[in-house]
């Protein structure tokens, strides 16, 4: 069940939008590291970073969804994915919440048509990490 106490989510915001990601997809949270650009990559793909000897693509989620580039003072959220290493640029880390803090769930209510969590202190759009990677890969093919 999505809102069981055993399921935990990390809350963060970027581009003026608040997100939640299941911690099962999180590998690490890091300060912004030296980025190396990728020639001819889309604007939302800022480059790659070296995290513990492993290269990860740096993804600007706010540029991707159209809310503008992230501001200064950012963190990286390194996602744990089976076939790729992806680091999302995040403007503000909030906190980790247990699933039972979710008051209600609205399907298809977020800015991107995603699931929205209603919390006691506001809303958060659920970030589907697998869907994000798939849609990012499809943007290279198009």
Enumerate the predicted regions with their spans.
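An acidic, low-aromatic, low-complexity terminal/linker signal
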Residues: 1-142
């Amino acid at each position: 069940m999505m809102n069981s106490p055993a399921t935990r989510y990390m809350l963060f915001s970027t581009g003026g939008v608040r997100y939640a990601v299941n911690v099962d997809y999180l590998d690490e949270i890091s300060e912004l590291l030296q980025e190396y650009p990728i020639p001819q990559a889309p604007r939302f793909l800022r480059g790659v970073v070296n995290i513990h000897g492993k290269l990860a693509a740096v993804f600007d989620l706010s540029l991707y969804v159209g809310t503008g580039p992230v501001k200064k003072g950012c963190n990286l959220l390194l996602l744990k994915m089976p076939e790729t290493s992806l680091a999302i640029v995040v403007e503000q880390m909030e906190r980790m919440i247990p699933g039972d803090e979710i008051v209600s769930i609205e399907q298809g209510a977020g800015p991107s048509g995603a699931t929205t969590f209603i919390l006691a202190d506001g809303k958060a759009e659920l970030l589907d990490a697998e869907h994000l990677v798939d849609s990012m890969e499809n943007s290279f093919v198009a």
